[in-house]
């Protein structure tokens, strides 16, 4: 809608507060930039000098992107409309070409995508609870003391996604090393009254969606139903899912609005287990025989996320937001000779208040945030699935072990950002206080108390996390930023029942007999960078260095066999360093009569290593390649046709902490051809992946010391594939 926007000094306006992949696509020109709106937070207003602008008003997505650019650190903004021009299977497709975000897909179309930012959850493979990143839907938490289950993260039905890397997620209650990812759902204001979408392709892949959204006076709604199925590239990777996402909003007055959210989703994925590098090169479609023999698979039989958010804007342009969340996420893991059913349910409550004042005659924004998430119920029951070995004489379904968990996370934070030089210099400072409560015990068999003195294990920690930041606007097209932040995170509640202490007799032999002491991970991070535009180039460049104490790591200490399940241990590492470079560049190479040629590139340098560890010295931490480079060269015609080629390069990474063996580097190539109707009704595409049929390790789960042996630690990525899709929007 066209209109006139007027801002004066007396009126306040809303402040939505390489390596190369071969030798073809290289970094060209300068560098690119971009990121929390009502999506992650509603910012207060600021006073501006008189400006009259004739043109279109900013829509919700544009306001969100503008607000993210006001963060004094590394951020990403992902517009779902751009993502939906190709295959949208999992979150891996959302985070393609995003600097600083490592997202890899293995194990078929498993929603348990491996996502890491600045080394967060560095050792977590595909299908694990996500760690080290705070996840939200529409500014309300999904993550909690049990970690982050992945099944609700359906990538269709989103308006956009916001990534605040590292300490830059401070103002939304995140104190995680990797920062926060906020998935923002469509509403009635930015969706079609009816939309249908269908995708199909290699390895039996199919996905369907039907959605609807409208504005009906003061009320608006959006609903989306999806289902998908895949046979999988690798043996033992068949999967299926189905889900619903929706919300209803009501504008009671210009100052008061409220929105209710509901998500429900089920998934069922076969799990292939890990293979060796030699097996990968010989036949990447093969699965671990131990997984095949027991037909290992993992079900999320029905996860629910229900939330409400109410926002009130006071006359003095301060804002209050109250949020409530209920999250239930059961798991049925049938991945070995035993079957473990997990029951988790959490509640979250959040309170955010921000206001604009003047300090020494300058605009000053103050924010307060309180967030608490607590387990209502949390347990794991392990039962006999396939009687064998020590359970050979027990019936299927017999209880072997039960573990129970309690936990809560409470974050209180206050921050201020002041504009010390008009439209030029902003200084910010904040402090968070966080309390972690954890309790874990093995309640059956009772003998666990005798076998492990740490049963039950209980932890209660208070920590403080300060942050200072600066933004300097050299000119309208060039910004410098920097910050010094502390992040603090506790281990997931269930992970306290891990380690080397196991039962030595009875049906539970080999299973953990109790808890182990795990300290919170603390990281101090210095970050600085720049973003802006020069000519036809948009850039975003960030450097960071984190000094990490008690880093939370995981390792396989016993592989699965035909008679026993695998055993994974969580532990605190000695001092480590995480440092890196995050670079994004979007270059307009050609433009004429509505046609354009763009080159988008992202490079992520990840240097993570021990600081003089007694056993591993200065070894690299396994799991994340040191170099990740992505690029896409795409030509867009004025009639809506687009064609492009893309590449992804990842360097080798160790598969063990001793650095005696590695998973090799790889280089993937792809291409895309599509048509996006100028009327915004039809979209069709053909998305080609891994054109050279590269055999590569998409994810690894490391061991302590491979002693140079080719251990089973690899999950392969998909081979060559073709995917086609069509979408129609009834406007």
Language model: regions and residue ranges:
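Transmembrane beta-barrel wall of Gram-negative outer-membrane proteins
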Residues: 193-195, 200-229, 234-272, 297-315, ...
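N-terminal periplasmic accessory domains that precede
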Residues: 94, 114-116, 133-136, 149-151, ...
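N-terminal periplasmic "start-of-domain" segments of outer-membrane beta-barrel proteins
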Residues: 50-86, 111-116, 133
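Membrane-embedded beta-barrel scaffold of Gram-negative outer-membrane proteins
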Residues: 214, 309-313, 319-325, 331-332, ...
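Short acidic/polar hinge/loop motifs at secondary-structure boundaries
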Residues: 125, 132-133, 138-165
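Gram-negative outer-membrane beta-barrel transporters
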Residues: 360, 419-427, 435-436, 538, ...
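C-terminal beta-signal and adjacent terminal beta-strands/loops
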Residues: 488, 652-654, 675-731
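Structural signature of Gram-negative outer-membrane beta-barrels, strongest in the C-terminal barrel
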Residues: 253, 353, 363-365, 371-373, ...
């Amino acid at each position: 809608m066209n209109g006139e926007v007027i801002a004066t000094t007396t009126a306040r306006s809303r402040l939505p507060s390489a390596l190369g992949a071969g030798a073809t696509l290289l970094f060209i020109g300068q560098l690119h930039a971009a990121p929390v709106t009502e999506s992650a937070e509603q910012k207060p207003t600021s006073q501006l000098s008189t400006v009259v602008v004739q043109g279109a008003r900013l829509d919700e997505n544009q306001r969100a992107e503008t607000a993210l650019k006001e963060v004094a650190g590394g951020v990403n903004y992902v517009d779902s409309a751009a993502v939906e021009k190709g295959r949208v299977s999992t979150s891996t497709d959302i985070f393609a070409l995003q600097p600083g975000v490592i997202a890899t897909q293995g194990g078929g179309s498993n929603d348990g995508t491996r996502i890491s930012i600045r080394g967060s959850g560095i050792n977590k493979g595909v299908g694990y609870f996500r760690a080290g990143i705070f996840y939200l839907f529409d500014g309300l938490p999904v993550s909690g003391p049990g970690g982050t289950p992945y099944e609700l993260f359906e990538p269709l039905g989103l308006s956009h996604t916001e990534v605040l890397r590292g300490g830059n997620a401070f103002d939304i209650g995140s104190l995680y090393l990797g920062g926060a990812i906020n998935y923002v759902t469509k509403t009635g204001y930015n969706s079609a009254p009816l939309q249908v979408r269908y995708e199909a392709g290699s390895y039996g892949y199919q996905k369907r969606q039907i959605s609807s959204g409208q504005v009906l006076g003061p009320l608006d709604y959006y609903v989306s139903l999806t289902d998908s199925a895949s046979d999988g590239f690798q043996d033992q990777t068949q999967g299926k899912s189905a889900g619903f996402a929706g919300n209803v909003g009501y504008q009671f007055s210009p100052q008061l609005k409220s929105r209710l959210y509901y998500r429900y989703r089920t998934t069922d994925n076969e799990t292939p287990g890990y293979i060796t590098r030699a097996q990968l090169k010989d036949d990447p479609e093969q699965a671990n025989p131990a997984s095949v023999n027991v037909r290992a698979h993992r079900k999320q039989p029905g996860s629910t996320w229900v939330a409400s958010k109410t926002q009130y804007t006071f006359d003095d342009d301060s804002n209050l937001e109250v949020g409530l969340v209920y999250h239930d996420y059961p798991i049925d893991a049938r991945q070995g000779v035993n079957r473990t059913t997990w029951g988790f349910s959490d509640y979250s409550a959040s309170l955010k208040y921000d206001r604009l004042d003047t300090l020494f005659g300058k605009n000053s924004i103050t924010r307060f945030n309180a967030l608490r998430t607590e387990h209502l119920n949390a347990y794991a029951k392990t039962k006999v699935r396939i009687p064998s070995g020590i359970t050979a004489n027990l019936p299927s379904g017999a209880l072997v072990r039960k573990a129970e968990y309690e936990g809560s996370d409470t974050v209180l934070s206050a921050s201020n950002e002041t504009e010390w030089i008009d439209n030029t210099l902003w200084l910010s400072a904040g402090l968070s206080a966080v309390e972690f409560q954890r309790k874990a015990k093995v309640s059956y068999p009772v003998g666990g108390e005798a076998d492990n003195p740490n049963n039950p294990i209980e932890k209660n920690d208070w920590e403080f996390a300060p942050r200072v930041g600066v933004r300097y606007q050299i000119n309208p097209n060039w910004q410098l930023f920097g910050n010094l932040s502390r992040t603090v995170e506790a281990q997931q509640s269930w992970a306290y029942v891990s380690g080397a202490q196991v039962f030595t007799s009875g049906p539970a032999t080999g299973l953990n007999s109790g808890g182990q002491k795990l300290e919170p991970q603390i990281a101090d991070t210095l970050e600085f960078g720049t973003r802006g535009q020069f000519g036809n180039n948009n850039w975003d460049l960030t450097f960071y260095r984190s000094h990490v104490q008690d880093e939370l790591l995981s390792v396989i200490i016993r592989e699965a066999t035909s008679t026993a399940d695998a055993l994974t241990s969580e532990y605190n590492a000695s001092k480590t360093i995480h440092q890196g470079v995050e670079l994004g560049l979007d270059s307009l190479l050609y433009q004429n009569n509505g046609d354009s040629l763009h080159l988008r590139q992202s490079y992520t340098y990840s240097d993570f290593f021990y600081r003089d560890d007694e056993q591993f010295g200065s070894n690299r931490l396994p799991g994340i390649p040191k170099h990740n480079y992505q690029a896409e060269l795409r030509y867009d015609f004025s009639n809506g046709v687009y064609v492009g080629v893309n590449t992804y390069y990842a360097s080798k990474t160790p598969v063990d902490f001793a650095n005696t063996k590695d998973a090799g580097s790889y280089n993937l190539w792809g291409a895309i051809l599509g048509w996006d109707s100028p009327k915004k009704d039809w979209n069709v595409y053909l998305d080609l992946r891994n054109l050279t049929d590269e055999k590569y390790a998409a994810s690894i789960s490391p061991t302590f010391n491979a002693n140079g042996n080719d251990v089973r630690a690899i999950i392969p990525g998909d081979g060559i594939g073709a995917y086609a899709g069509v979408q129609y929007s009834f406007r």
